[in-house]
């Protein structure tokens, strides 16, 4: 687990996390890690290849450890009892593909959002942007729900499923880039009718934001305002920033003029559609933060800095170049700001017009909102084309792009709608909008920094070292 970057110092008086040192938790972690190499991708264990007498004691250790820890989580009594039952059922099936639907339905963290409330989470699951296999994982976490955030959620940004959280400790599936705990990742016999919660680790978001942004600012010679600099030095303040960003972003997926299912979970679309949707949610957050700042909210300006810096510096150069929709969204924001004179790259230094940047950022948000509203009256292929035209006004497509050649090059001779949509998606290059020369250079310089944030948390972080 990587808690520190080379540029961040350890806080000498960091509080001890007692449950993370509890003997039962340590036994639970060890048993989970011993089970990991025995499990297949779907979470099952092949007893023709692994001796059962090797597996049974490990699962028994998990069950007894959960039972020993359960009194620390009286609010999760029904859930932890269901975990024990699901583990027993898994053993009874001969460790076939695990089914933890009963325990998933019993775990309802959104029903009790209390600041500092702790949860023990045990599920067979994959971790988004982390481990793709449904291994058994265990996480100790804390809910972040300060009164000011609860008041905003009650009165302005209703989001009953949103659960901001921080890590206390975790198994290897979270020693990755994953910053979310989502119910849809859990191994179940059938998906619930609806999901009722979603957890986002604001400490991981804040810590990697601070590390990457601090290094990017130094590399690019960017002069930033004093309040932005102090944000980068304060882990707790950055976490408060991200819980507000996440609250508004997450809510925005289901608000506005939406020509499609807001999360597009069951739809296949060209990847720029996902990129525009995520960017729309972030730019809406930025726009709301501008308004909140005018009303005196103390976190609102920090949210504006965070959206700009994370979108401009981390998103475009994180991950691979295969349908990297978040990277595309970050490039689009940079190009839009650049073409509208809100930022400049001259003499090997980046400069931002801090007065103009909010206006231009909100203008890009307005362009995407117009695209969405117009899309309600368009057939799907026409909407995809309009979105491509918006993106390609600011980002240069790959020279070999079929889409860039126009509708004449696309397979509109197909008359079956499903076949046409599939062919249009198949015509998209994996890297339809390659990195600009600016981002190619930045990627080489930041790649090591970004790699160092794998598994990062807020534990033990204080100010940025000089």
Predicted regions and their residues:
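Non-catalytic terminal regions of proteins
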Residues: 2-190, 194, 359-466
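Long, well-structured alpha-helical subdomains associated
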Residues: 6-13, 17, 239, 286, ...
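Acidic, low-complexity proline/glycine-rich segments
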Residues: 204-219
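Short pre-active-site segment immediately N-terminal to the catalytic Zn-binding motif
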Residues: 228-245
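Active-site recognition of the HExxH zinc-binding catalytic motif
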Residues: 242-258
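Conserved helix-loop functional segments at active or binding sites
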Residues: 253, 257-261, 287-294
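Post-HEXXH active-site segment of zinc metalloproteases
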Residues: 257-279
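An active-site-proximal "capping" alpha-helix that borders the catalytic cofactor pocket
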Residues: 274-290
């Amino acid at each position: 687990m990587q808690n520190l970057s080379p540029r961040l110092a350890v806080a000498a008086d960091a509080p001890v996390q007692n449950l993370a040192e509890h003997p039962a938790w340590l036994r639970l972690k060890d048993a989970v890690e011993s089970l990991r190499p025995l499990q297949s991708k779907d979470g099952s264990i092949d007893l023709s290849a692994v001796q059962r007498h090797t597996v049974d004691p490990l699962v028994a250790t998990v069950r007894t450890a959960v039972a020993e820890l359960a009194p620390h989580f009286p609010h999760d009594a029904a859930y932890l009892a269901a975990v024990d039952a699901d583990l027993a059922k898994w053993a009874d099936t001969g460790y076939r593909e695990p089914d933890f639907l009963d325990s998933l339905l019993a775990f309802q963290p959104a029903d009790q959002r209390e600041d500092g409330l702790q949860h023990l989470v045990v599920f067979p699951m994959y971790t988004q942007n982390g481990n793709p296999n449904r291994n058994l994982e265990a996480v100790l976490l804390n809910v972040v729900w300060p009164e000011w955030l609860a008041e905003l959620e009650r009165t302005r940004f209703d989001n009953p499923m949103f659960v901001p959280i921080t890590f206390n400790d975790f198994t290897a599936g979270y020693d990755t880039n994953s910053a979310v705990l989502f119910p849809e990742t859990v191994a179940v016999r059938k998906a619930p009718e609806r999901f009722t919660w979603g957890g986002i680790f604001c400490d991981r978001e804040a810590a990697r934001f601070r590390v990457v942004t601090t290094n990017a600012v130094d590399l690019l010679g960017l002069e930033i305002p004093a309040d932005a600099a102090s944000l980068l030095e304060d882990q707790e303040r950055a976490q408060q920033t991200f819980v507000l960003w996440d609250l508004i972003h997450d809510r925005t997926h289901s608000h506005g003029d939406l020509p499609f299912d807001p999360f597009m979970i069951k739809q296949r679309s060209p990847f720029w559609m996902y990129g525009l949707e995520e960017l729309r949610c972030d730019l809406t957050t930025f726009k709301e933060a501008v308004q909140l700042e005018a009303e005196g909210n103390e976190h609102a300006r920090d949210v504006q800095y965070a959206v700009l810096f994370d979108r401009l510096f981390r998103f475009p150069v994180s991950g691979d170049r295969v349908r990297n929709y978040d990277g595309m969204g970050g490039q689009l924001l940079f190009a839009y700001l650049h073409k509208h004179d809100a930022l400049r790259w001259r003499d090997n230094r980046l400069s931002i017009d801090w007065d103009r940047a909010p206006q231009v950022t909100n203008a890009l948000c307005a362009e995407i909102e117009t695209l969405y509203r117009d899309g309600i009256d368009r057939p799907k292929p026409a909407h995809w084309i309009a979105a491509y035209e918006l993106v390609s006004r600011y980002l240069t497509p790959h020279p070999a792009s079929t889409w860039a050649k126009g509708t004449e090059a696309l397979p509109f001779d197909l008359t079956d709608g499903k076949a046409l949509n599939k062919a249009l998606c198949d015509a998209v290059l994996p890297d339809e909008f390659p990195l600009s020369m600016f981002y190619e250079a930045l990627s080489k310089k930041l790649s090591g920094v970004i790699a160092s944030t794998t598994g990062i948390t807020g534990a033990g972080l204080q100010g940025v070292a000089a």
